[in-house]
């Protein structure tokens, strides 16, 4: 192929007779043989040789610039696609690495949680065994109580290196650790102190040489052959010695050389047998502890369990286990003897005690409980707990303010102990549980375990829960002033300012549109009042209910069936009668099922006792001359139904004898009984089982009074606004309060602490919650608000 130079048409590579494609896309003919430039015009065409017609139908040829341009374009596209591919590949690799790491993290988390669960189960079994022994004096048969085993440790045991290499590596590591400890100033004298603690724990005197203990006594200590007399002596040891034992157990991992030195007198066969037993029981958990940092970290979190467990006496705890603490160090491959400098050791001991005193408060959470346990074990017997009434806690006065404490001591009241005794709510067994300081472990359970009856109240655990809104009752047109539950059925009655009462069956629900709660439609509406309904009471059998209104009447109703048809015809027999005697609004009602009597208090200043079944239902009238003011609330005394308590707008509350109509005790919060408080009382309730009265005040306070002396035993600011309503659960464990700050608060009557706060209603005209109630037999609570809603919580 010849290379020809072209003129205006450019260069071309082609057979001379064929046309060629220039860079610009124009066809050009090759120049003549004489090298004259071909202009691509007609003269050049004439000299081209063959005619042009058949030449145009042949395939077009490419020029070098066009080919280079195409190659460069394709190469750029290929490089771009390759770059995109590499980016996608890197992203996918990063995604794969992230998912692998996430999977590995989840597996590690799962293993750690499984390990913790096993350790918690093991610790709980130990605590139950100790509790059973402390309560009944006998060992609890739980089978072979073994430390939990983990898969990683089993594989490590299976792949154990030869003993000689392991011993050599262990020696080198120990020497390196000694060098590091010397560099940071942690000398052998500290180890000497640790050695001395081991000797004191074994009962050896300081003057005895190392290894001089008799083999028989040592074997008895190590293998658990301890007599009951020795156990009793250990329980009566001074608390200081036991606390030293706790300090040792907190900080020291036992010295392997000292342990091996002390068991030299044990026969070889028994030693091997004991080591074999250790391996079976623990599966290398203690021996390979340093090889598995996760296991070591998990075990460190349970140091407080070891401390509490060894509180009964270090010797007893050492001798009664499976030999874990001793056998762990028996596996050490070497043994050394440390010389103890008694003078230096005693100085370091004193210095250590001083340091521990400074750290003791923040070091151990359960330290106080352990000290209380030691003190209680030193006494001849546990504090006596009276069987019907609460006992006084030794630490109750220290938990109160000086002012309130002085009042409590004057009145000798039935206090709510918040300390060691805790016998207001709990029985003697719960006192023992709190003394042991189990903390959260006391609530843990292990499946397939023996069920020990601790004589706890039946409904105590049922109430230890979080209440959540479940039902919303929306059919009233004005504020809901009062509500009450049926004694047995899941049925609620509400009284409203819209002049009506409504009956609700909580089992007939309608799903709400935009809420997790359920709407309930009323199944019956009571209509007889000609004004707002202010108060409500239901009989103990649930067959009648009573309502008091601003029209000064008390309406007596027969309760319809919970399964009544809401669209049934009107039944006139539902309204059983009307009790007329008051001349102003009836603000409070209370019913007693013992004598089927009804109490009412009115704005006319009187409190009236009714027996609705009689022809003249009004039995007696109290405070007829308004000598104490205007009554605001009334209730029967729970532990003495022959008495009732009434609160007044003057800030005082009076206990009346229903038989004699005489006032017995005035409950006043003032130090000087001649002065009366101006704090308006909105609600008064009586504790169901104790001689205690609780009042809710306009000044945001809730106050507790002793019914026998009339003295206030506790006072607390309970809400951010006026406290309007109170309710005590049927077991007397919890108190519920409602306020105009839109919140419901649940209080533990033992500790006077708020267990839960619920924001339930909205404000309307600066008022929010009017009433709260517990269901007598089911897990329901309810609240009534000024926003025309009633809410039920489960």
UniProtKB/Swiss-Prot annotation:
Pfam assignment, any one: Striatin
Record PTM N-acetylmethionine, positions in chain: 1
Chain spans, region Disordered: 1-59, 309-339
Renumbered residue ranges of the record's region Calmodulin-binding: 164-181
Biased composition (Gly residues): 1-12
TM regions (residue ranges): none
UniProt GO cellular component terms: dendrite; FAR/SIN/STRIPAK complex; Golgi apparatus; neuronal cell body; nucleoplasm; plasma membrane; postsynapse; protein-containing complex
UniProt GO BP: negative regulation of DNA-templated transcription; negative regulation of hippo signaling; negative regulation of intracellular estrogen receptor signaling pathway; response to estradiol
Main location: cytoplasm
GO molecular function (one): protein phosphatase 2A binding
UniProt repeat feature WD, residue ranges: 475-514, 528-567, 581-620, 676-715, 718-757, 764-794
Secretion signal, residue range per the UniProt entry: none
Phosphoserine PTM sites in chain numbering: 200, 212, 227, 255, 332
Membrane topology, record value: Peripheral membrane protein
SMART domains named among the record's database cross-references: WD40 (SM00320)
Entry's localization field: Cytoplasm; Membrane
Coiled-coil positions: 76-135
Region (Caveolin-binding): 70-78
Record keywords, A-Z: Acetylation, Calmodulin-binding, Coiled coil, Cytoplasm, Membrane, Phosphoprotein, Repeat, WD repeat
Superkingdom of source: Eukaryota
Modified positions (Phosphothreonine) in chain numbering: 149
Subunit structure, interactors included: Tetramerizes. Part of the core of STRIPAK complexes composed of PP2A catalytic and scaffolding subunits, the striatins (PP2A regulatory subunits), the striatin-associated proteins MOB4, STRIP1 and STRIP2, PDCD10 and members of the STE20 kinases, such as STK24 and STK26. The STRIPAK complex can be extended by adapter proteins such as SLMAP:SIKE1 or CTTNBP2NL. Interacts with CDC42BPB.
Function: Calmodulin-binding scaffolding protein which is the center of the striatin-interacting phosphatase and kinase (STRIPAK) complexes. STRIPAK complexes have critical roles in protein (de)phosphorylation and are regulators of multiple signaling pathways including Hippo, MAPK, nuclear receptor and cytoskeleton remodeling. Different types of STRIPAK complexes are involved in a variety of biological processes such as cell growth, differentiation, apoptosis, metabolism and immune regulation.
UniProt family annotation: Belongs to the WD repeat striatin family.
Protein name, per record: Striatin-3
Gene that this sequence comes from: Strn3
């Amino acid at each position: 192929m010849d290379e020809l130079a072209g003129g205006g048409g450019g260069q071309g590579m082609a057979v001379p007779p064929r046309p060629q494609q220039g860079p610009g896309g124009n066809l050009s003919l090759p120049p003549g043989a004489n090298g004259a430039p071909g202009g691509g015009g007609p003269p050049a065409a004439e000299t081209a040789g063959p005619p042009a017609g058949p030449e145009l139908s042949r395939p077009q040829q490419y020029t070098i610039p066009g080919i280079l341009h195409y190659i460069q374009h394709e190469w750029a596209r290929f490089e771009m696609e390759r770059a995109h591919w590499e980016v996608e590949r890197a992203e996918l690799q990063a995604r794969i690495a992230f998912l692998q790491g996430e999977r590995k993290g989840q597996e590690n988390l799962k293993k750690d949680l499984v390990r913790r669960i096993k350790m918690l189960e093991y610790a709980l079994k130990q605590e139950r065994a100790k509790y059973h022994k402390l309560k009944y004096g006998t060992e609890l048969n739980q089978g072979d109580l073994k430390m939990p085993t983990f898969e990683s440790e089993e594989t490590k045991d299976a792949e154990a290196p030869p003993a000689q290499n392991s011993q050599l590596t262990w020696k080198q590591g120990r020497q390196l650790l000694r060098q590091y400890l010397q560099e940071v100033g942690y000398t052998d004298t500290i180890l000497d102190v640790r050695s001395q603690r081991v000797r004191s724990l074994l009962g050896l005197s300081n003057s005895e040489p190392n290894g001089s203990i008799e083999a028989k006594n040592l074997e008895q200590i190590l293998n658990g052959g301890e007599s009951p007399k020795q156990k009793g002596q250990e329980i009566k040891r001074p608390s200081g010695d036991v606390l030293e034992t706790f300090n040792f157990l907190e900080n020291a991992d036992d010295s392997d050389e000292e342990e091996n030195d002390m068991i030299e007198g044990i026969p070889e066969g028994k030693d091997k047998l004991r080591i074999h037993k250790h391996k079976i029981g623990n599966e290398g958990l203690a021996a390979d502890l340093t090889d598995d940092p996760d296991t070591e970290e998990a075990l460190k979190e349970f140091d407080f369990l070891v401390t509490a467990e060894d509180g009964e006496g270090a010797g007893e705890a050492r001798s009664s286990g499976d030999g874990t603490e001793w056998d762990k160090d028996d596996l050490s491959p070497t043994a050394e003897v440390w010389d103890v400098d008694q003078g230096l050791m005693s100085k370091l001991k004193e210095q250590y005690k001083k340091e521990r005193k400074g750290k003791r408060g923040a070091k151990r959470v359960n330290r106080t409980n352990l000290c209380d346990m030691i003190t209680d074990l030193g006494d001849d017997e546990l504090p006596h707990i009276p069987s019907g009434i609460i006992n006084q806690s030794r630490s109750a006065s220290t938990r109160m303010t000086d002012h309130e404490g002085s009042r409590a001591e004057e009145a000798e009241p039935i206090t709510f102990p918040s300390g060691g005794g805790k016998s207001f709510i709990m029985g003697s067994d719960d006192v023992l549980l709190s003394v042991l300081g189990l903390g959260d472990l006391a609530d843990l359970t292990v499946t397939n375990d023996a069920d020990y009856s601790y004589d706890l109240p039946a409904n105590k655990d049922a109430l230890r829960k979080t209440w959540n809104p479940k039902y919303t009752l929306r059919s009233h047109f004005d504020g809901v002033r009062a509500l009450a539950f049926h004694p047995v059925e899941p049925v609620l009655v509400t009284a409203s300012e819209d002049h009506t009462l409504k009956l609700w069956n909580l089992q007939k629900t309608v799903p709400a549109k935009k809420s997790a709660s359920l709407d309930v439609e009323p199944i019956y509406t009571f209509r007889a009042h000609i004004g707002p309904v202010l108060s409500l009471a239901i009989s103990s059998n649930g067959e009648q209910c009573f309502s008091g209104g601003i029209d000064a009447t008390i309406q007596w109703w027969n309760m319809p069936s919970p399964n009544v048809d809401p669209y049934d015809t009107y039944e006139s027999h539902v309204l059983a009668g009307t009790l007329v005697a008051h001349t102003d609004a009836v603000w409070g009602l209370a019913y007693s099922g013992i004598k089927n009597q009804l109490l009412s208090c009115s704005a006319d200043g009187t409190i009236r006792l009714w027996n609705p079944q009689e022809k003249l239902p009004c039995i007696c009238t109290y405070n007829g001359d308004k000598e104490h003011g205007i009554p605001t609330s009334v209730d029967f005394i729970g532990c003495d139904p022959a008495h009732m308590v009434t609160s007044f707008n003057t800030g005082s509350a009076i206990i009346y004898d229903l038989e004699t109509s005489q006032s017995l005790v005035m409950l006043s919060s003032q130090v000087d009984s001649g002065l009366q408080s101006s704090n308006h009382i909105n609600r008064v309730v009586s504790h169901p089982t104790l001689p205690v009265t609780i009042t809710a005040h306009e000044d945001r306070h809730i106050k507790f009074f002793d019914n026998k002396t009339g003295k206030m035993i506790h006072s607390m600011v309970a809400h951010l606004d006026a406290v309007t309503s109170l309710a005590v659960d049927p077991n007397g464990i919890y108190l519920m309060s409602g306020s105009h700050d839109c919140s419901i608060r649940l209080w533990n009557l033992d500790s006077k602490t708020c267990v839960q706060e619920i924001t339930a209603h909205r404000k309307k005209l600066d008022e929010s919650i009017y009433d709260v109630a517990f269901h007598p037999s089911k897990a329901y609570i309810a609240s009534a608000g000024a926003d025309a809603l009633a809410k039920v919580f489960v």
